[in-house]
Amino acid sequence: AAFVAQDPEGQNVRQGLFKLPDYCSNYQAEAVAQREGVICTNKELGHPGVQSWVIASDGSAVLASMKGQRRMTSLVGEVVREVEDGHSFVYVPGHQGHAGNEMVDALAKEATVGGRRVELAIPRAYTRRLCRDRSWQLWSQEW
């Protein structure tokens, strides 16, 4: 997961790279990137010339959860709790040439080997898949 904070001219002000456990989903990676981006930009709000931040994300599922259109996970709840006045969120389609999004995608790949380690709860979907796979394995051995 990764985020980039840019000024109005498109210059990088801050960035963050985060290595997530292998069991994490893309949804969790998007939520971590948004949470960490909000935490970072909260520190910048109120500095001279900094009135607001626009958080652009290609994570439509996380954005929908934040707006209440989907069930909000505890991780997305953390994003919502961290948001202060001066933040707005916008969806940008991924892999469509948006410079900031392309940069973040490249940083996210980099983060898989060199990012700051982040621990997250194991998602229910992952444990269900492990149980299902194990059940199939045992069944195939028996029959």
Predicted features and spans:
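C-terminal functional segments of enzyme domains
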Residues: 44, 48-143
